[in-house]
Amino acid sequence: MIVFCRLKGLTSVLYSSQGIGFEICKKLGAVGVKIIAACRNESLGVQAVAKLHALGYDVEYHNIDLSNDASIARFTNGLSEHYRSIDILVNNAGIAYKINETRSYDEQAHAILTTNFFGTMRFTEAILPLLRKAKAPRIVNVSSQGGLLKILKSETLKERFTSCSTTQQLESLVNEYLTAVYDRTYGERGWPHANYGVSKLALNALTRILAKREAATNPGKNFLINACSPGFCDTELNHHKGKRTAEYGARTPAMLALLSETGPVAPTGKFFYNDAEINW
């Protein structure tokens, strides 16, 4: 069991307005963490912050669109003007489409990868300088078991994902997938049909890459970067088909955000489900 004990004087950034993201905000706010809630839908963001304020939590809202580089720059520049450091980053951004979606498969794949992977990666890279200034920074990437390696039909692709050592290599691999989608060869090349799964697989690989990079460039920093699956929860993202509550799904992300472990045994670059590490 991992105890929530990093309580005072921490500042967290969460991409959230409802569902699991909102419940993560509640769990962090309840232990005294200042929350900077960011999301694209301003109306939902303002409503979420009002609810959190009513609970007595220290929270502020900022608008950001992860599919827009200028929006990411405005947000991170604004943070740098007002905060010396950021202690926790929870990446909870994610879009998915209904089975009867009228957009083409190409359009869906492009939109999902743009937000769930490329946008999240660029946002994380932009905010890393502030995280590095914290005493014991944490990044939590909220992923999915739908993004485990087993979704790939090609052993070569599995090996390429696990051996990626730079974000540039990973970007190239994800762009290969999009190219295969556009020319209708993704199936024969070993890619799955589930573009949401590919976006989360890429996020899991990004987690490992960033964890290794930060451990190598900032040894002794106690910078922990992990990914997790909240499980199949009853949220807007899956059209309320999940069996778990959003509150239950927020448990593991909140646990990772508040990890107190230090030293060589502290988990970083790992994937968690039900509060425990599993293979990705």
Identify the role of each PLM range.
Residues M1-I36:
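Canonical Rossmann dinucleotide-binding motif of NAD(H)/NADP(H)-dependent dehydrogenases/reductases
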Residues V31-Q47:
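Conserved glycine-rich Rossmann-like NAD(P)H-binding loop of the short-chain dehydrogenase/reductase
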Residues E42-S43, N63-R74, D106:
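The beta1-alpha1 cofactor-binding region of Rossmann-like NAD(H)/NADP(H)-dependent oxidoreductases
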Residues R74-N77, E81, Y97-T114:
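Active-site Tyr-X3-Lys motif and surrounding loop/helix of classical short-chain dehydrogenase/reductase
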Residues I95, T102-H110, R132-G220, S229-P230, ...:
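Catalytic loop of short-chain dehydrogenase/reductase
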Residues A227-T235, H239-W280:
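C-terminal helical subdomain
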